[in-house]
Amino acid sequence: MKKMNLSVLALTAVLGATTLVATSCKREGCTDETALNFDDKAKTDDGSCEYPSTTTELIEVEGDITTTVNWTNDKQYLVKGFLRIQDGGVLNIEAGTVIFGDTQTKGTIVVQRGGMINANGTAAEPIVMTSEKAPGLRQPGDWGGLVICGNAPNNVPGGTAELEGGYGAFHGGTDPADNSGIIRYVQINFAGVPINPNEEVNSLTMGSVGSGTVIENVQCAYGLDDAFEWFGGTVNCKYLVAYRGLDDDMDVDLGYSGNVQFALCIRNASSADQSGSNGFEVDNDGQGSTNTPFTSATFSNVSLIGPKADRNVAISLQFQNAAQLRRNNKLKI
């Protein structure tokens, strides 16, 4: 009996050793196929899985741009106050980049004369400029918008003018082919800031922008003032969308003489400005003078869809005209 007990103990010891060896052969690692470090040979997950970051770095920007600056789509940008691209400065914005306007300081991008912005988005990866608030909480006028000042002619005596509001955005010169950069496949949403009564920053404000500048495939939505406004200049624009703005869809004055083709403007029944909202508002200048060059731009293939979807829809009493053409303008539609 004593000999038999020793044999049992020996067998138990051998089985135990075999179990230990088998267990130690099971490879541990990350077994989640969606992880960055997935190990297809691992049998047991050891909790080491790594995943792509869901947090995009937010960079605050303000002040002046005087050199070449690149914004990339792996980051997001918060514009605070007036961000000015000064003479000689260049801002390049990669397709797919998201830019937020600060609501407290009413962030606004201003391209000064001699500065350049290259916001070159694509249909698949548009550049989005919008309110910093969370979706569902955003409101018209949360931030300023985009302002471009060029060196093309206008009809202001002396040739140089400051954009309304007095925020130091001067425009005008003698170069019809002036180039302020590229605005392509860009969304400008929830912009427009009142500076003084009847003086606002629009979603996209263009002061004497030259024909060397590319502006196409631009959407301005939910703006507090005009969607697009041209103060003089010669820039040609294509594929513009104005959606549910408060004031005018397209405001044209101070001798703008470029060409605009393919535009769509859609109104909301209850969104109209106290000053009166129009599809087009066109003047030669604010005084109705005969200063030259006359406001003589050509608009082609434009669709204006008004606020009254059917006769039973109640609309704001502040709506005025599809096209308010007045005071010595020579616009062609």
Feature roles, as predicted:
Residues 4, 13-15, 21, 274, ...:
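Intrinsic disorder/low-complexity segments
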Residues 9-14, 325:
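Outer/extracellular conduits and scaffolds centered on Gram-negative outer-membrane beta-barrels
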Residues 2-5, 16-57:
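Bacterial Sec-dependent N-terminal signal peptides
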Residues 5-6, 10, 137:
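Calcium-binding acidic motifs and repeat modules
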Residues 26, 52-333:
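Beta-strand/loop edge motif enriched in small/polar residues
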